[in-house]
Amino acid sequence: MFLRLFRKYSTAKLAQDLRLYDGRLKEKVPLQIHQSKPYISFYTCGPTVYDSAHIGHASCYVRLDILQRILRHHFQLPLVTAMNITDIDDKIIVRAQEQQINWEQLARQYEDEFWSDLKRLNVRLPDVKLRVTDHIPAIIRFVQTLVEKGFAYTTIDGSVYFETSKYERYGKLQKVVIEPANESNKGYKRHPSDFALWKASKAGEPYWVASGFGDGRPGWHIECSTLASHLFGNKLDFHAGGLDLRFPHHENEETQSCCYHNVPDWVTHWLHTGQLHHEGQTHKMSKSLKNTVSINELLKDYSADEFRMLCLLSHYRNVIEYGPEAMVTARNVLQKFKSFFSDSKAYVDGLKPATYDAASTDSLLAKLSETRSSVVQFLNNDFNTANPVLALGELASSVQRLINSPQQSASHSSLIGSTNVGAVLAATEYIREELLSYGLESMGKQSTQYIQSTSETEQSLEKLIETIVSTRSEIRLQAVATKDAQLFKVCDLLRDRMSVANVELKDHGKTSSWSFRGRSTK
């Protein structure tokens, strides 16, 4: 009973605070939550598995993963997520013929690769995976119902088309002018805007037997309508995909689903992610343009977190520019946070001298409160993620200014409970929690040397690094005591060589600390 009341309260508050962009109205609207439902449905259009996925696909799924994480973590919504896999399509048939293999074998190969790619990108897999060929009988029944209701017609070759002129609200997502019927094309497609629900098979192509119309296979749009309806019924809370799917795919989905279920609107909130362009180009990355970068190629040069940070630094509806400059920016932002966590840990562990400044502590706690409030406001504004990252960076800078403050003196060593450790820890853990909530795995405590490693090899490596750092610290203390320039050069040289090995050394008075820099999450 308490949980039901809490959920009703929290979702009501969410509907009041969160604003989402509505592509139909061209404005932001409150989130509509059906409080009687025990879960929130979230359906994503998956790939047609005829080839390897590229980073244009990756940007869409990483961005949607970020949105789902925000809905779950920040707004405590009980999402149930689903994604389809289109494993029968003209492109699959053609590619299988080119490679002289069975079409099912080809589809399974690229489907397995797709799920593997999502895992490597730290994208949470959907709660339910819906493969088209596992639901052919349901698709046939969906098509038959639309024919019986008078919204679809059968052509002389056994194909079935949806008649767009029969649905007055066609063009709901994107304005469409329905042209007059082609009277000379009797027996076939009646209007240019009519779309295939069922495609009659040609010789040598895979097919399924369907009573009432010809043997064949599903059209593209009917697949998602059937699969989502099969799982979630006559109402979807969220339906997501790339901006290029808004028309005709999502338009046609919405149309046929409203007619099938006899509802005014099938989807409450459409979420469309912006496309990915190469730096300096104005057209999207696509296989037809032969300008794609595979996910495997991406992860050879960059970590999954670096690509995720690239996605976080722009609004999910905006175009992402991909290239060396953009990726260096994303990498640098990540590295600044990693360096901050290393500094903070060194301070808390006593490797950096403690600071004693009550005014600075109060200022930091005020900054923490301000950042919390700002992040909530940004996320409420149609999932703005770029500004929260900037706000967290500013908070991290405030912490670093405090722990590197000159207000460090042995004269305060007798004071009890007067250091800034509590405020530093509070701000540090808040920043870490936020970044982890966006799916940035390397922001966890396991990204530094302070966590217990489960690998004996890593443990040995860390002991070796500790020994090197400790020895260097002794040399450095000797250099300070004797003012020996040559010893200082040796210390600097060792620090630079460790940096090449992605180990960052930092000196704190008489002590030093280290952390892994730019460790890949692959």
Task: Outline where the language-model segments fall.
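Alpha-helical recognition segments enriched in aromatics with Gly/Pro capping
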Residues: L5-Y50, D65, H74, S116, ...
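N-terminal, positively charged nucleic-acid-binding surface of large information/translation enzymes
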Residues: L25, P30, H34-N122, K483, ...
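Short, well-structured beta-strand/strand-turn elements
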Residues: L77-V80, G150-I156, A501-K506
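Short, glycine/charge-rich beta-strand/loop segments that flank catalytic centers
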Residues: A82-I88, E111-F114, R124-I139, D157-T164
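Short low-complexity, flexible loop/linker segments enriched in glycine and/or proline
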Residues: V94-Q97, N252-E254, T521-K522
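The substrate-binding groove and active-site-proximal loops of carbohydrate-active enzymes
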Residues: A96-W103, D127-T133, G214, G242
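Structural preference for alpha-helix termini/caps and helix-kink/transition segments
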Residues: H283-M285, T292-K522
